[in-house]
Each structure stands twice: as C-alpha cells, then as structure tokens.
Amino acid sequence: MKFLCWQKSIHGS
C-alpha cells in the first residue's frame, strides 16, 4: 500500500 507509506511519514514527522 503506497498511501500507507506516505501516511506513516506524515504521522512520523
């Protein structure tokens, strides 16, 4: 899941 990839990045920021 690509959308999960960037979503994790946003939450981790």
Swiss-Prot record:
The lineage of its organism: Eukaryota, Viridiplantae, Streptophyta, Embryophyta, Tracheophyta. Keywords: Nodulation. Modulates the action of auxin, and may function as plant growth regulator that alters phytohormone responses. InterPro entries: ENOD40. GO terms for biological process: nodulation. It comes from Pisum sativum. This is Early nodulin-40.
